[in-house]
Every structure is written in structure tokens, then in C-alpha cells.
Amino acid sequence: MAKRLPGNRLRPHVKAHKTSALARLQHDAGHQGFTCATSREVLGLAKAGLGDDLLLANETVDVSRLAAMAATNARVTVAVDSDATIDAAAEAGIRECVIDIRVGFRCGCEVDEAAQLADRARASNIEVRGVMGYEGHAMGVVDLDRRRELVKAAMERLVEAHSLVGGELITGGGTGTHAINTWVNEIQAGSYVLMDTAYTEQTDQPFSQGLFLQSTVVSVAEKFAVCDAGLKAQGMDHGNPSWGDGEILFCSDEHTNLVPDNSVKVGDRISLTPAHIDPTMAKHQVLHLVSKGEVIDRWDIDLRHW
């Protein structure tokens, strides 16, 4: 990705991996700014010395958390889309924001509200760095032509809002639209670094699967087997995980039932591929780095929680 979107053209979203060690590799590859979903991610990156330019791409009215972010040595920018979010940011001592524009079905203000909100922020001594809009409704669309249509419609709204607000940033996008969203000047992709089955269904994606969930076969029946990783071990909002050596039947709280292509026995270790990495990472404490079947390092997933 560093070759596709060098430097500040990419603002990696750490909500995907929640790991400061991995963020450091992204930083070393030339990406000085990061997108964050939670105050914990902002504070964790600041503590790790990766606070060159942190964008909290979510609205919050929690003044105490905003104040904690403002008190770090990091450069912190927050997304705002209402008088209430601007007032909370001002009370907490936040000094920079972007106006979040509703370009789909997420947060954001209407285009015709953007200028008024920018004026309110500036009157509160908050610099408006530009606009943000996340076309999440387009991100997972498999058909490329349809994805292009959705991105175009969404980004036309964002560009119009930017003409009213000003600032150097037009920020948005993600892994699913990183190659086709030519309207923004920085892309907030996150999943690309580990990938999941939801994105690998898009045949135009150049990224390889990097995250696997290790599980153990704990029971074997005549026509199926059961492993010990279920709903509580992985993100399920995008469907079942996949398994390269058989078929997934269903997942329950602590187990996944599967039909193996070849016989398995109790105690066998298997690798599941999660359908959605973000919530999967939030459920675990450690990433094990594996090369040629050997664990070569362990990274704490230290940016979890709120």
C-alpha cells in the first residue's frame, strides 16, 4: 500500500489492527498520520510516540475523554457534525477538527449545514482542517462498477461541502475504495494490512490474507467436527469464517462446526480466516507473528477497548 498511496496520501485506520507495533511499521513506511476510532487508540498511539497527526474519525461529547486526548503531546484532530460535538471539543481544549459530512448512512451533517458548523468551530478557537466523509455503504460492494457509482455520488457531496468549509483535508475512503476514490486527498484504509474474507471477495483487491485465527479440534463426529473458536472469538457481522480445508457449518458461542475435506482428530490445530478483522482483533490480546510455521514474535493488541 505504501507504493500505491505513499506518505500522507494514506492515513491508516488503526481500528483494523489495534496494535501500536503494527502502526509503527506503517509509520516507518512513510505514513505519518493515523485514523482512530476510539480515544483509547488516540491515547495509545500518543503514548507510543506515534502522535504526529491523529484523527479521531468519530463524534463524541465525552469531555473527559476529549480532554485526555488534548492533554497529550500528540496533534489531535476530531470529527464534528453538530453544535454539541463542537462545544464538547472546545470545552475539552481540542484545537483542530474536520467537519464530518453525511455521504451515506453513517454520522455526519448535511452539506448545507457544513459552513455554519465550520464558523461555530472557528469562533470557538478550533481550526477547521477540512472535511471528512466515509462511504461505508460502498466499501464492501463486490461489483466494481456499482462500487464506483456509489463512491462518485458520495464524494460529490463531500467535495461540495469542502467548497463551503475550506481547509487542506478532504479525508475518507477505505480499503474497498482506495483505488477508485480519487476525490479525497487522503485515504483512511485499515483492513488492507491484514485483510478478511469480506474484502477478498472483491477481485480487484491486490492484498493478501494476513490474519488467521488458530483453533483446536475438540470433538469429532461421523459427519462433522467441532473446534473451540466460536462467536466470542471472531467478528461475525460479515458472516461465518472460512476454512481452506473444509466447509463451515455454523458458529455458536464457543464452537464452530465444520465438515473437513479430510479426516481430522481431536487435538488437531486448524486456521480459520475471519470474515471481519476489526471485531476479531478486539476480542484478543496478542498477535503471534508466524513465518514458515514458526512463531517469530508476539505483539500486544494494546489499542483495544475505549
Question: What would you call each of these model-derived segments?
Answer:
Residues 10-133, 138-140:
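Active-site-proximal beta-alpha core segment in soluble small-molecule metabolic enzymes
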Residues 147, 176-245:
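Active-site loop ensemble at the mouth of alpha/beta enzyme cores that anchors a bound cofactor
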Residues 1-6, 12, 53-61, 121, ...:
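Alpha-helix-loop-beta-strand connector modules within alpha/beta enzyme cores
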Residues 220-306:
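C-terminal accessory subdomain/extension
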